[in-house]
Amino acid sequence: MKAQELREKGVEELNTELLNLLREQFNLRMQGASGQLQQTHLLKQVRRNVARVKTLLTEKAGV
């Protein structure tokens, strides 16, 4: 997910995206804990995408 794509979204869409990413992160962590996760790089990607969305939400809030 590119930052430019995220910048085009509104606050509600970003909140929805954040919720989806956090759910995905939780599922990946559970798979990793149970030894079922084959693609460990996905954890890093999701973590960084969460950070991107949170950064944009902060920017849009004007804080």
From Swiss-Prot:
Presence of the UniProt keyword Ribonucleoprotein in the record: yes
Record keyword Repeat present: no
GO biological process, one term: translation
Name assigned to this protein: Large ribosomal subunit protein uL29
Keywords: Ribonucleoprotein, Ribosomal protein
GO cellular component: cytosolic large ribosomal subunit
Record HAMAP family: Ribosomal_uL29
A molecular-function term among this protein's GO annotations: structural constituent of ribosome
Family according to the record: Belongs to the universal ribosomal protein uL29 family.
